[in-house]
Structures are given as C-alpha cells and as structure tokens.
C-alpha cells in the first residue's frame, strides 16, 4: 500500500511554548508602536484645535481626532489582550520547566542512591573493624616500647616527706640569702680621730693613754731602759 499511495510526509512538530510567547510579544510590540503613532497624531490635532475658532473647520479636525482616538482605544484593548496571553503562556512555561527540573532532580537522586548502594557493597564492615583493632594493638605496643625506652635504673626511692622537708629547707636558704643585715657592720664608715696624730693633748671623754704620731700607744720609758 505504501508503494501505491506513497508514504505521507512526517508530521512536523508544532511550535513550542517559547515560540508562541515570542510571537505574541512581537504582535503586542507592533500594536504598541501603532498606539504611539496615534498619540502623536492626536497631539497634533489638539494643537490645531487650540488655535482655531469655532466653525466647520474646527469641527472637521475634531472628527479626525475622534476617529484616531477610537483606533487608539481599539489597539490598546488588543495590546492588553496579547500581554495577558503572553503572561499566561509564560506561567505555563514556568510550571512545565519546574516539572522538568523536578524530574531531573529525582532522576539524579535515584542515580546517586544506586551508586551509593553499589559502592556500599564493596565495603566489608568486618574488615574495617579488624583494621581498627590492629591499629589499637599497634598503638598499645608503641606505648610499651616508649615506656621501656624511658625506664631508669639504679635510682634510689625517695620518700615524699623527705622531698618536702628538703624543699622547705631550700626556701629558708633563699630567704637567708636575701637578708643583707650582716653587711651593715662592713659598710659602716669609721669614726674620725678625735685629735691629730702626734698630739699630746687629751680630749675630754677620751682615753688617757698617750699615743705616738701613728696613733699607737707609746711604750713607757721605764720599759725601754730595761
């Protein structure tokens, strides 16, 4: 049958929603341009009537202005209708796109869960627990090695009371070192002599022993002759 009558042409896909929106917006833009031109024509007629006196000429211009105004109103209704159509189609397009995005999200989530299940099958929980136990044993052995290396030998045991007594004694020694009162006698200045060296005069209140020019006691004469 196909050979006798031939195959029908494949049906072409209809315009998409975006194409319809673009077409309606273009028609609305064209009508709005016509409205703008009619407004300019109305301003021209209004200026003419403002400069004319009442009479047949002014009435003729007025009729033209009324005709242009009717056209403007008709175009405004068409433009509003087209804008409403475009808005409704945009809302429908947004809803359709949201559904597509939702489907894509769900498909991606399903694929992710499938991959997670596949990877989870490759994991052996018992093997992981064995590894953790082995690591714990190795850390414990490492601690034992460190403790053995840091062990000391030949050190006598010291009582805590003895250590405390030695610490208290050390504090007393430090306090004694800080006491400088024993230096007072050393740094004290000597008194000035009460008389000049070699003088024989006796100062009241002082010793009566005679001294020589060096301040030393003189040897009695009787002892010299002996």
From Swiss-Prot:
Keywords for the protein's UniProt record, in alphabetical order: Coiled coil, Endosome, Membrane, Phosphoprotein, Protein transport, Transport
Protein location: Endosome membrane
InterPro entries for this protein: Snf7_fam
One of the Pfam families matching this protein, by short name: Snf7
Modified residues (Phosphothreonine): 226
Residue numbers of Phosphoserine PTMs: 201
Topology term for the membrane: Peripheral membrane protein
Region (Disordered): 188-226
Effect of loss of the gene: Homozygous lethal. RNAi-mediated knockdown in ovarian follicle epithelium results in cell proliferation in the germarium epithelium. Stalks between adjacent egg chambers/ follicles become elongated due to increased number of cells and the linear arrangement of germline cysts is also disturbed.
Biased composition (Basic and acidic residues): 188-198
Sections of the chain in a coiled coil: 21-93
Keyword Phosphoprotein: yes
CC terms in the record's Gene Ontology section: ESCRT III complex; multivesicular body
Principal location: membrane
GO biological process, one term: endosome transport via multivesicular body sorting pathway
Keyword NADP applies: no
General function of this protein: Probable peripherally associated component of the endosomal sorting required for transport complex III (ESCRT-III) which is involved in multivesicular bodies (MVBs) formation and sorting of endosomal cargo proteins into MVBs. MVBs contain intraluminal vesicles (ILVs) that are generated by invagination and scission from the limiting membrane of the endosome and are delivered to lysosomes enabling degradation of membrane proteins. Specifically down-regulates Notch signaling activity in the germarium, probably by facilitating Notch endocytosis.
Assembly information from the UniProt record: Probable peripherally associated component of the endosomal sorting required for transport complex III (ESCRT-III).
Family designation: Belongs to the SNF7 family.
Name this polypeptide is given: Charged multivesicular body protein 5
Naturally occurring in which organism (per UniProt): Drosophila melanogaster
Phylogenetic placement of the source organism: Eukaryota, Metazoa, Ecdysozoa, Arthropoda, Hexapoda
């Amino acid at each position: 049958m196909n050979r006798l009558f031939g195959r029908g042409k494949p049906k072409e896909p209809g315009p998409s929603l975006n194409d319809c929106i673009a077409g309606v917006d273009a028609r609305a833009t064209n009508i709005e341009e016509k409205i703008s031109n009619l407004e300019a024509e109305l301003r021209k007629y209004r200026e003419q009537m403002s400069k004319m006196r009442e009479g047949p000429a002014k009435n003729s211009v007025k009729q033209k202005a009324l005709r242009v105004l009717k056209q403007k109103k008709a175009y405004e209704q068409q433009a509003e209708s087209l804008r409403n159509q475009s808005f409704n189609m945009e809302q429908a397009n947004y809803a359709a796109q949201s559904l597509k995005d939702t489907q894509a999200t769900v498909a991606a989530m399903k694929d992710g869960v499938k991959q997670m299940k596949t990877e989870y099958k490759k994991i052996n929980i018992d093997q992981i627990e064995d590894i953790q136990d082995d690591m714990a044993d190795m850390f414990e052995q490492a601690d034992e090695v460190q403790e053995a290396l840091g062990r000391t030998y030949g050190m006598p045991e010291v009582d805590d009371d003895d250590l405390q007594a030695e610490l208290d004694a050390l504090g007393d020694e430090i306090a004694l070192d800080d006491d400088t009162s024993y230096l007072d006698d050393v740094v004290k200045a000597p008194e000035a002599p009460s008389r000049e060296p070699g003088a024989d005069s006796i100062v009241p209140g002082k010793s009566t022993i005679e001294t020589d020019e060096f301040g030393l006691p003189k040897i009695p004469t009787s002892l010299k002759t002996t």
